[in-house]
């Protein structure tokens, strides 16, 4: 679980996302409140429920990017799902309870990695002994009688192994055979039954081992993983993972505006209002049955986001609106924002193109005038056609660099300066012609 302060979280998000301070602050406070809640007494902790967030803003302004970056900062089970992938219970398609099952799977993976990291030292020792046994096998008749000379030889080989002198030497070792992958095709909505059947068939096979010949360096890695897996207690793992999901789990529901009921539609709407009704108990708090055990959703944080271009937040059913109490509006991006997006974030678009062309030996230099012209071109196209936010920069940059990308392999050692004239020469006719920009940019 992350112990970062709200200021630290916002600072980290600032290095990847330009603007949208309100959204960053809300997300940072929500994440910090997870930590604050765990510091309370047990009886009070149970009463403090998360304040779910609804992010509203046009496409391409950073809603999904905030979710992606938050997943790395949270150090907790996190899942991002598209609301449009689900249908009402009883109809063809995924049920919303699958969200919690996927979140639990993510917690199992996270917990297993943590537990294996804790016992890595013991696993390395056990793996080292197995490699030495393969290098210095004892005669069967002398298996129980260890001579001093044998021990001295073993220590010599141990030293060489640790120094990497034996990395390229090949040995034969017994490695746990991978379980046979049994793929079962199931109708949509029956994923849980499929998982149970797969688990049943996999558990029927004995834990056989397979003798393989490989370099010591590769064998050492495989044996460490195998020994670490043996040291992890499966029951404790499930118990800790479920506790982690219940107390620290975060679900990011993207495209929630796409499941708003349209005013002109009539009859049952199984992929819109039906999904909203199914989401209610999850967000409010219920118990979901997963293959790892029962999971309570009372303290899972839900962050929903949507562009709401064809609908508005009030089109969500009232009960769901009430369960998303914190509303954050993200602002549309200006030409100045585009300039900052091109230069300020870590691994910005301009940095990426400079690095990509550098692999061909071509040096690309972006001048301030060129960056201003690119930002202005992207903003103009957004204003004249559909406003798709910062995603327009990808289209404009790809079009701008298309010719150079094609010829880069023949221009090794050359220098290309991207200034206002370069941008005008490559983009001006497309930006000015509305029909061309509509279909090409």
Curated annotation (Swiss-Prot):
SUPFAM superfamilies: P-loop containing nucleoside triphosphate hydrolases (SSF52540). One of its GO terms (molecular function) is proteasome-activating activity. ATP binds at residues 18, 60-65, 254, 319, 391. Transmembrane segments: none annotated. GO terms for cellular component: HslUV protease complex. Keywords: ATP-binding, Chaperone, Cytoplasm, Nucleotide-binding, Stress response. SMART domains: AAA (SM00382), ClpB_D2-small (SM01086). It comes from the Bacteria. It is found in: Cytoplasm. InterPro entries: AAA+_ATPase (IPR003593), ATP-dep_Clp_protease_ClpX (IPR050052), ATPase_AAA_core (IPR003959), Clp_ATPase_C (IPR019489), HslU (IPR004491), P-loop_NTPase (IPR027417). GO terms for biological process: protein unfolding; proteolysis involved in protein catabolic process. Its main location: cytoplasm. ATPase subunit of a proteasome-like degradation complex; this subunit has chaperone activity. The binding of ATP and its subsequent hydrolysis by HslU are essential for unfolding of protein substrates subsequently hydrolyzed by HslV. HslU recognizes the N-terminal part of its protein substrates and unfolds these before they are guided to HslV for hydrolysis. A double ring-shaped homohexamer of HslV is capped on each side by a ring-shaped HslU homohexamer. The assembly of the HslU/HslV complex is dependent on binding of ATP. NCBIfam families: hslU, PRK05201.1. Belongs to the ClpX chaperone family. HslU subfamily. This is ATP-dependent protease ATPase subunit HslU.
């Amino acid at each position: 679980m992350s112990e970062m302060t709200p200021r630290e979280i916002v600072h980290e998000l600032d290095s990847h996302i330009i603007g949208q301070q309100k959204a960053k602050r809300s997300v940072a406070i929500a994440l910090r409140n997870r930590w604050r809640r765990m510091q309370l007494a047990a009886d009070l902790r149970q009463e403090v429920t998360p304040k779910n967030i609804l992010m509203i803003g046009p496409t391409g302004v950073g809603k999904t990017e905030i979710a992606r970056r938050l997943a790395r900062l949270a150090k907790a089970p996190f899942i991002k799902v598209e609301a449009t992938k689900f249908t009402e219970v009883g109809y063809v398609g995924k049920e919303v309870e699958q969200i919690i099952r996927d979140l639990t799977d993510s917690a199992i993976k996270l917990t297993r990695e943590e537990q294996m990291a804790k016992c890595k030292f013991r696993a390395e020792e056990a793996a080292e002994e197995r490699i030495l046994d393969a290098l210095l096998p004892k005669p069967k008749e002398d298996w129980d009688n260890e001579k001093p000379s044998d021990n001295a030889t073993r220590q010599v080989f141990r030293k060489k192994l640790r120094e990497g002198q034996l990395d390229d030497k090949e040995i034969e070792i017994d490695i746990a055979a991978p379980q046979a992958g049994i793929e079962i095709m199931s109708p949509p909505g029956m994923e849980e039954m499929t998982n149970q059947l797969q688990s049943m068939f996999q558990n029927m096979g004995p834990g056989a081992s397979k003798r393989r010949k490989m370099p010591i360096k590769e064998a050492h890695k495989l044996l460490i993983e195998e020994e670490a897996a043996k040291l992890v207690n499966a029951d404790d793992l499930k118990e800790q993972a479920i506790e982690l999901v219940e107390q620290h789990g975060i679900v990011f529901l993207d495209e929630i505006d796409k499941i708003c009921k349209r005013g002109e539609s009539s009859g049952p709407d199984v992929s819109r209002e039906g999904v909203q009704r199914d989401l209610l108990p999850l967000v409010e708090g219920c118990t979901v049955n997963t293959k790892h055990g029962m999971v309570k959703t009372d303290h899972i944080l839900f962050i929903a986001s949507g562009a709401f271009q064809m609908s508005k937040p009030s089109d969500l059913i009232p009960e769901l609106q009430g369960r998303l109490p914190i509303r954050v509006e993200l602002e549309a991006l200006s030409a100045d924002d585009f300039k900052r997006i091109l230069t300020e974030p870590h691994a910005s678009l301009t940095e990426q193109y400079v690095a990509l062309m550098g692999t061909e030996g071509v040096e690309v230099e972006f001048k301030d005038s060129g960056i201003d012209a690119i930002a202005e071109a992207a903003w103009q196209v957004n204003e004249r056609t559909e406003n798709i936010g910062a995603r327009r920069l990808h289209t404009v940059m790809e079009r701008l660099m298309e010719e150079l990308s094609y010829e880069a392999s023949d221009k090794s050692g050359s220098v290309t300066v991207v200034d206002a004239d370069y941008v005008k020469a490559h983009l001006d006719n497309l930006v000015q012609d509305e029909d061309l920009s509509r279909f090409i940019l």
